[in-house]
Amino acid sequence: MGVAVRVVYCGAUGYKSKYLQLKKKLEDEFPGRLDICGEGTPQVTGFFEVLVAGKLVHSKKGGDGYVDTESKFLKLVAAIKAALAQG
């Protein structure tokens, strides 16, 4: 089993496509090494929260916005690499 990456997103806001784009990009970066799951909220929450190995790494509600820049993506990559190094 790979590193657990969990994305909680606002399903009612239509963020599923953003989740799927992020999932594909992470799978391309770490083929076969991640266990990615997404959960869309049925009510409007504005969520786009990314947890790596149970640790909150990215939070739209916390002011991070979407994972829409290379620097935001690299922050996730660094967290995943650290989790992989810990085994």
From Swiss-Prot:
Kindly give the InterPro entries that the UniProt entry links to this protein. Answer: Selenoprotein_Rdx-typ, SelW_related, Thioredoxin-like_sf
**GO BP annotation list:** response to selenium ion
What are the GO cellular component annotations? Answer: cytosol
- Source domain of life is Eukaryota
Entry-annotated residues carrying S-glutathionyl cysteine: C37
Q: Where is this cross-link: Cysteinyl-selenocysteine (Cys-Sec)?
A: C10-U13
Q: Where in the cell is it found?
A: Cytoplasm
User: For this UniProt entry, what is the primary localization, expressed as one broad class?
Assistant: cytoplasm
**Gene Ontology molecular-function annotations:** antioxidant activity
Q: Which UniProt keywords apply?
A: Antioxidant, Cytoplasm, Glutathionylation, Redox-active center, Selenocysteine
Subunit info?
A: Interacts with DPYSL2, PRDX1, YWHAB, YWHAG, HSP70 and HSP90.
The UniProt entry, under PANTHER family, shows: SELENOPROTEIN W
The UniProt similarity line reads:
Belongs to the SelWTH family. Selenoprotein W subfamily.
Task of the protein? Plays a role as a glutathione (GSH)-dependent antioxidant. May be involved in a redox-related process. May play a role in the myopathies of selenium deficiency.
Record's protein name = Selenoprotein W
Q: Which organism is it from?
A: Sus scrofa
User: Which lineage is the organism of this entry classified under, starting from the top rank?
Assistant: Eukaryota, Metazoa, Chordata, Craniata, Vertebrata
Q: Which gene encodes it?
A: SELENOW
